[in-house]
């Protein structure tokens, strides 16, 4: 039996071949010679213990011979680390019969060491040299880890703790890292600190002026009262304007139109008054007025043009004559009424009767205003009706003019041709025929 890995080739059997149990020729005192037993005991326990063991005949319990001292020297387990271990050098490195808690085994030389005062002194020296930027790069961390025999995690943790400690002690001499720096750009430099200092100086300079302004405000309480009254008046005016906008938009339109007409009428008068010759000024003023008159209706017509429904503008263009008459601008109130009443749909007074409202098609409830032919024919006849019927504004006409006679004759002819128009705006007995005629008229207007 040989064990070359243990350092010896064979083991001699302790018991001889002629044992008492085997051969029965020898006695128990001849189991092993005294010299062999003493040699084995002396190699294991030392000379005094070996003599005592041999005297008491313990040779049967020692399976090793004198040539095989397995434990020649034993070091103490409780001495310094430099002393030899419990195991003999002849044995190979043992494999652990358990899994260690960490990633390193107990006797592994790569196991991280605790940070000692000597290892952290190197890190402190590097930190003192880089007080303005205490953020080591990856290469610097690797270099410091090799020098101090520490891991990268330990080095990074130490620097983080050092920066936190300096920050608590108000000994920061570096600019904090911004978000752009974390993305890979350069770290904060001295220029950023200068910018912060400049901002602080500007704030300190502004503090004095702010204090002076606050003192002036405290010394002059009347200014606050006046400002409050101004703001209140302004808010009241704004609120009143908003109320007027909600309630009376037509009044504002009237005011604007009247203002324009006053300006147009005052301009030629001023020009006439400033002229030196009275005789020359009068025809000039009359000429200016004549020039102003045809140009003024487009201004009036342009204002409500945006509010016209498309269907009524088409109806007007289809029914207007080739030479529409132009009424001179004699009064501002009549023109403003025309502006308001142009092309609007209003409810007929006949809607008060249930017979008119209960029909399937109530075309007679709506009255079409400011259509050229209808206004010419109905402006005279319907003014004679009572307050219950709809009244139509009539354009001012000059007295004793030939145009008025022709217009009246044309209106009489239209009334004879279209008798339905007299009954379209007031309740009559024959409703079915009137309903059909009104529907035909409205459909013709809409199609045109």
Curated annotation (Swiss-Prot):
Residues 171-250, 387-410 are annotated as: Disordered. Pfam families: Homeobox_KN. Residues 108-170 bind DNA. GO terms for molecular function: DNA binding; DNA-binding transcription factor activity, RNA polymerase II-specific. One of its GO terms (cellular component) is nucleus. SUPFAM superfamilies: Homeodomain-like (SSF46689). Residues 195-222, 238-248 have a biased composition (Acidic residues). CDD domains: homeodomain. InterPro entries: HD, Homeobox_CS, Homeodomain-like_sf, Iroquois_homeo, KN_HD. Residues 223-237, 396-406 have a biased composition (Basic and acidic residues). The keyword DNA-binding applies. GO terms for biological process: brain development; cell differentiation; dorsal/ventral pattern formation; negative regulation of neuron differentiation; negative regulation of transcription by RNA polymerase II; neural plate development; positive regulation of DNA-templated transcription; positive regulation of neuron differentiation. It is found in: Nucleus. Expressed in the neural plate in overlapping patterns with other irx members, which all share an anterior border of expression. Outside the nervous system and at tailbud stages, expressed in the developing otic vesicle, branchial arches, prospective heart region and pronephros. Keywords: Activator, Developmental protein, Differentiation, DNA-binding, Homeobox, Neurogenesis, Nucleus, Repressor, Transcription, Transcription regulation. Belongs to the TALE/IRO homeobox family. Acts partially redundantly with other irx members in neural patterning. Required for formation of the posterior forebrain, midbrain, hindbrain, and to a lesser extent, spinal cord. Both up-regulates and down-regulates gene expression during neural development. Acts early in neural plate development to induce proneural gene expression and specify a neural precursor state. Also up-regulates repressors that prevent neuronal differentiation. This is Iroquois-class homeodomain protein irx-3. It comes from Xenopus tropicalis (Western clawed frog).
């Amino acid at each position: 039996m040989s064990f070359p890995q243990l350092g010896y080739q064979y083991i001699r059997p302790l018991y001889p071949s002629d044992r008492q149990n085997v051969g029965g020729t020898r006695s128990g005192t001849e189991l092993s010679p005294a010299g062999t037993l003493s040699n084995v005991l002396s190699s294991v326990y030392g000379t005094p213990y070996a003599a005592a063991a041999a005297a008491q005949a313990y040779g049967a319990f020692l399976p090793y011979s004198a040539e095989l001292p397995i434990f020649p020297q034993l070091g103490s387990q409780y001495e310094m680390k430099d002393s030899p271990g419990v195991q003999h050098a002849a044995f190979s490195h043992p494999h652990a019969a358990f899994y260690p808690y960490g990633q390193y085994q107990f006797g592994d030389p790569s196991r991280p060491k605790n940070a000692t005062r000597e290892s952290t002194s190197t890190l402190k020296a590097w930190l003192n040299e880089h007080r303005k930027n205490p953020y080591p790069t990856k290469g610097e961390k690797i270099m410091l880890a090799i020098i101090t025999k520490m891991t990268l995690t330990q080095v990074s943790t130490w620097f983080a703790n050092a920066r936190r400690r300096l920050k608590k002690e108000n000994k920061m001499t570096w600019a904090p890292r911004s978000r752009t720096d974390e993305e890979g750009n350069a770290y904060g430099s001295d220029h950023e600190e200068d910018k912060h200092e400049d901002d602080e100086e500007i704030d300190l300079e502004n503090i004095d002026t702010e204090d002076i302004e606050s003192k002036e405000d405290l010394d002059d309480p009347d200014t606050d009262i006046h400002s409050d009254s101004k703001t209140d008046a302004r808010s009241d005016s704004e609120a009143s304007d908003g109320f007027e906008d909600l309630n009376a938009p037509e009044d504002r339109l009237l005011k604007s139109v009247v203002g324009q007409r006053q300006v147009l009428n005052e301009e030629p008068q001023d020009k006439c008054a400033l002229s030196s010759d009275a005789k020359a000024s009068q025809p000039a003023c009359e000429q200016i007025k004549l020039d102003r008159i045809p140009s003024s209706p487009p201004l009036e017509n342009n204002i409500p043009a945006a509010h016209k429904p498309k269907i009524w503008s088409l109806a007007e263009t289809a029914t207007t004559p080739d030479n529409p008459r132009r009424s001179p601008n004699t009064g501002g109130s009549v023109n403003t009424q025309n502006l308001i009443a142009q092309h609007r749909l209003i409810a007929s007074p006949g809607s008060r009767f249930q017979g008119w409202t209960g029909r399937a098609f109530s075309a007679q409830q709506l009255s079409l205003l400011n259509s050229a032919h209808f206004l010419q024919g109905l402006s005279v006849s319907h003014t004679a009706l009572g307050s219950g019927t709809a009244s139509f504004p009539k354009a001012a006409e000059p007295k004793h003019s030939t145009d008025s006679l022709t217009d009246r004759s044309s209106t009489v002819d239209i009334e004879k041709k279209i008798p339905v128009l007299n009954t379209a705006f007031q309740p009559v007995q024959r409703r079915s025929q009137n309903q059909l005629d009104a529907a035909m008229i409205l459909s013709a207007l809409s199609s045109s």
